[in-house]
Amino acid sequence: MSKLDLGPAGVALTVSDTYLGQAAELERLGYSALWLPGGQIDDLDRLTEIIRATTAVPVASAIISLDVYPASSVADLYARLEAGAPGRLVTGLGGPQRPHPLLALNGYLDQLDRAEPPVPAQRRLLAALGLRKLELARDRCAGAIMLLVTPAYTSAARQILGGDSTLVIDQMLVLDADATRARETARRPLRFLSGLPGYRASFARMRFTDRDIDGLSDALVDQLVPWGDAGTIATRIGEYRRAGADHIVLHVLNDGGQPGPMEVARELAGGLLAGSPSAAP
């Protein structure tokens, strides 16, 4: 299977009154993919709206939950968009939060394979943290999306995926050099995610202790969520690329006073997109 080329960096959008205009600006800035987080996908046609608001950039879900949308709905979305905007939709899939998740995932992928037209493996990515989901991402999708991992764990995932699969890092970050403030912003989503069995197990595999996980220690926060000025964040992103990531999603966290996604995207664009064919002249 040929690798899915998403370019160097994309941005996670937040649905708002202005998000379609933001999508168009991000494409003009040269970002090579646009991402809609699962919590923002209250309707699959949000992805359609982003594609219509832009001209050529790939638009990806991160992720469509198997617990929320049946395979038939994803297949219908793909068929509609492939007819009108071929090659632009990337289906990032995740879950399910139920017993025997691998069995459910394989069944869901089987349905996408049998759809008319099928949603091809080359246009599917799978949220994966553990060994078996990474293997499934390698064998039945174009690759994996990973959230809240270290560069060392990224390197280990690359070894499992091999060289022909795409590895996307959904990178939470905070553009703020104040350590106390930045860490508190980072801890807000971590308080919820650290309570989910899959993330807790993933943190343990990265050798974080129960005390680190329960208390969301500075060490855990600092290793999983880059924060600081633009140069510091760009350096941290470079570590993930050197570890084997193909594409970085800027998933910007802020407390309302810190820079938001568009401010961060504008500030980081020059360094992250240098040399990218999609970069604006």
Where are these regions (language model features)?
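Active-site-adjacent structural elements that line small-molecule/cofactor binding pockets in enzymes
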Residues: 1-281
